[in-house]
Amino acid sequence: MTVLQDVDIDIYASEVLLLIGPSGSGKTTLLHILGRLLHPMHGVVELHGKPTAFLDADELAMQRLKHFGFVFQAYNLFPVLTAAENVMVALDLLGASKRVAKDRARELLEVVGLGDRLDAYPSHLSSGQRQRVAIARALAGDPEILMADEPTAALDAENGLKAMELFRTLARERRCAVVIVTHDPRTQRFADRIVHLEDGRIVECSTLAPFPTANALHAPVSPPLSQGGM
C-alpha cells in the first residue's frame, strides 16, 4: 500500500518543524521513516549527506539511539522505576556506567524541569510530568533530531503550551531539530516551518522563521514510498 509519494524534505538544526494534515495523510509514517523506525521501499534518507540505508539491525539501533530521540503518544515509562531510573534505562543502552547514568539522568530531568521529582514513580506524576520524563529519556543520547507524535494530545491547554515551549527551548539551546506531528493548531505559533501533508503528498511548506542553512537530515522520497507492508 502506497502511503507517501514525491516527498522531499530537509530538516535543519535548531528548528521546530511541524507535520500537519488530516488523519491518514502520512504524517506519522513520515516521522517514523525520518527516524529510521520504518524503511522506505523507494527513495533514501540521508544524515549529513550520507545515506542511512544498508545498516544491519545493530548499527541501525545504535544510530537511532545516538542521532534520534523519540517521544511517543504513549510515554512507555516503566511503572516500577522512578523518573531517574526510567531515564537511566536509555543511558544504560548507550553504555554509560551506573554512576555516570545516575548523574546524567539527574541533569536531564533538571533540563525538563523535574529536578525535584527524581525519585517519583510515574503513578505519582501528572500526565505533563510523565511526558517530561519521556523527553528527558529521549535526550539521553544528545540527539540531533528530537521527534514527537502528537505531544499535546493528552494535555490540557496550559500544559500543552508548556510542552511546546520546552520543545522550542530544547531546539534553540541544544541545537537539535525538533520534528512534531500534530493536529493542534495552538502549536503552530512555536514552529519555524510547517509541512502540510494530504493523501501522502506535501501540499504546502510554510516558513515562519529563519533557520540555518546547514541541514541535519535530508529525505528525498520519489518514486512513491510504501509503508513496508503496514
Regions found by a protein language model. Name each.
Residues M1-F190, L197:
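ABC family nucleotide-binding domain
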Residues R193, R201-S226, M230:
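Conserved beta-strand-loop-alpha-helix hinge in the C-terminal portion
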